[in-house]
């Protein structure tokens, strides 16, 4: 323990060791986008669904803040204050009145700029990891408040499961989701910028009438029933037309997934990852194999949902 010149030790005390958190990516089962507001944002109504494609984030005490990223898309990510995980560390430290002296190590599986909120997931994981590492015992409501300051998708990465999101997506209500749903995720060869997709949606709406969704009640009913065949025709994303406009290859990928046996396919969020809902785990394996050989995407992954939000990974010998 260090001691300051005035004899105060408490504020410098931090436990040693590390904290590792697993955090899921998300698929938007339903995404309705309101018209652009005066502040530049759009009102959203969305059904978030956390899936078993996870990033693993380890935070350790250090002499200064640092960030290292490995895995899926690591070469495309900044490792400084431009990264949302770095901003999360600074925000948490500011919240509790400390310096953000931690090292962050991120092992990524969630695609970068893929519409699955990978950056938001990593930010949520840093909040949870620092809360554990520094033994802060902050309540979940404090973590949710900090998460909402970081971005619209960060609160859901904390929440996990399935949830109805409103506002900019940060206001969440838990949705009952019976059963496990089976997904095949097709990663595109390049990413899409979320602001660019919103801008394209605004442009499409200025010149025409891209499809608008009905209210999400039937989607919630299908989730409560736990029936993938009931859910499949209800999947909808008002941003999909804009994503396909910017990356026309997505149309081929969506068609190929359904032809391979998926019940339905959808662009996740702002894209360009395509998510295919399958009847069973066996069907997901078949669809994955066929999509892998179809030449319409870079990588294919199988996932299930819903899964929990950001959670500390217990170290050996500690209770869950």
UniProtKB/Swiss-Prot annotation:
The keyword DNA repair does not apply. It comes from the Bacteria. The keyword Nucleus does not apply. Keywords: ATP-binding, Isoprene biosynthesis, Kinase, Nucleotide-binding, Transferase. It catalyses: 4-CDP-2-C-methyl-D-erythritol + ATP = 4-CDP-2-C-methyl-D-erythritol 2-phosphate + ADP + H(+). Catalyzes the phosphorylation of the position 2 hydroxy group of 4-diphosphocytidyl-2C-methyl-D-erythritol. NCBIfam families: ispE (TIGR00154), PRK03188.1 (NF002870). This is 4-diphosphocytidyl-2-C-methyl-D-erythritol kinase. It comes from Mycobacterium ulcerans (strain Agy99). The gene is ispE.
């Amino acid at each position: 323990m260090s001691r300051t010149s005035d004899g105060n030790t408490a504020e410098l005390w931090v436990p040693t060791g590390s904290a590792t958190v697993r955090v899921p990516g998300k698929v938007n089962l339903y995404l309705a986008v309101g018209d652009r507001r005066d502040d530049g944002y759009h009102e959203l109504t969305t059904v978030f669904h956390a899936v078993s494609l996870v990033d693993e984030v380890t935070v350790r005490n250090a002499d200064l803040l640092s960030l290292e990223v490995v895995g899926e898309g690591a070469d495309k990510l900044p490792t400084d204050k431009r990264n949302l995980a770095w901003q999360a560390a600074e925000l948490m430290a500011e919240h509790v009145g400390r310096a953000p002296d931690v090292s962050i190590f991120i092992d990524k599986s969630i695609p970068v700029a893929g519409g699955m909120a990978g950056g938001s997931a990593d930010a949520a994981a840093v909040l949870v990891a620092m809360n554990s590492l520094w033994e802060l015992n902050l309540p979940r409501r404090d973590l949710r408040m900090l998460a909402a300051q970081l971005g619209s998708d960060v609160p859901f990465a904390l929440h996990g499961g399935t949830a109805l999101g409103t506002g900019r997506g940060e206001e969440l209500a838990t949705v009952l989701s019976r059963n496990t749903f089976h997904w095949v995720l097709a990663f595109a060869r390049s990413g899409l910028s979320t602001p660019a997709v919103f801008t394209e949606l605004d442009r499409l709406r200025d010149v025409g009438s891209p499809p608008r969704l009905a209210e999400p009640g039937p989607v919630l009913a299908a989730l409560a029933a736990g029936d993938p065949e009931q859910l499949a025709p209800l999947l909808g994303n008002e941003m999909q037309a804009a994503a396909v406009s910017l990356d026309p290859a997505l149309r081929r990928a969506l068609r190929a997934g359904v032809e391979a046996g998926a019940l339905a396919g959808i662009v996740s969020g702002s894209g360009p990852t395509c998510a295919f809902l399958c009847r069973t785990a066996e069907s997901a394996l078949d669809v994955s194999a066929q999509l892998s050989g179809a030449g319409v995407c870079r990588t294919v992954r199988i996932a299930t949902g819903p899964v929990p939000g950001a959670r500390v990974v217990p170290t050996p010998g500690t209770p869950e």
